Amino acid sequence: TYMHDLIHVNEALSGLPVDVDFISFENVKAGILDKYDIVINAGRAGSAWSGGDAWKDEDVVTRLYRWVYEGGAFIGIDQPSAVEGFDSYYRMAPVLGVDEDTGAKVCHGKWQFKVEDSKGILPEGATVPEKENRFLTDGKAKVLAAHDGNPDLTIHEFGKGCGVYM
């Protein structure tokens, strides 16, 4: 299971006093988001875990942007909302404040950041898997864990809501 982030998320959630629903992109388009406080998208690009080509649907992306802006929390794990063919690799990059450089961009530098204290967010001794080629999209995300200039855990305010990347 080391390759499948969503399995670890499911295991963690199963021990918490929270209600969990699995929703589809069709559910999002049908307006179901108002029932939820948090949406999690986890997995590798192109996989059913992450959503693959479903992220090409502008209606899905627009509805999620609006929902977060109005107070929701979007948690993206590994390569959330990743799909080729758009100005950002992660369709939810404006919400997350993080994107991935797949080599398609000519980068003239990255936003500089300082790693902020994550006390109370990460349990003692816990780590976040290191990811390569990640960068901040606007320099406003709070970086709570990083390695070699790559943000690994961030929180980014988006309207009344936020995006969390790990």
What kind of feature is each model-predicted range?
Residues 32-34, 40-41, 86-93:
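Substrate-binding cleft/loops of secretory-pathway carbohydrate-active enzymes
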Residues 2, 47-166:
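A conserved amphipathic helix/loop scaffold
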Residues 12-16, 42, 63, 67-70:
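Generic, well-ordered alpha-helical scaffold segments in large soluble proteins
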Residues 33-49, 53:
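Short, well-ordered secondary-structure micro-motifs within conserved domains or adaptor modules
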Residues 25, 38, 43-44, 79-82:
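An acidic- and aromatic-residue-enriched active-site/binding cleft used to recognize and process polar
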Residues 1-38:
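Aromatic-Pro/Gly-enriched surface loop or interdomain linker
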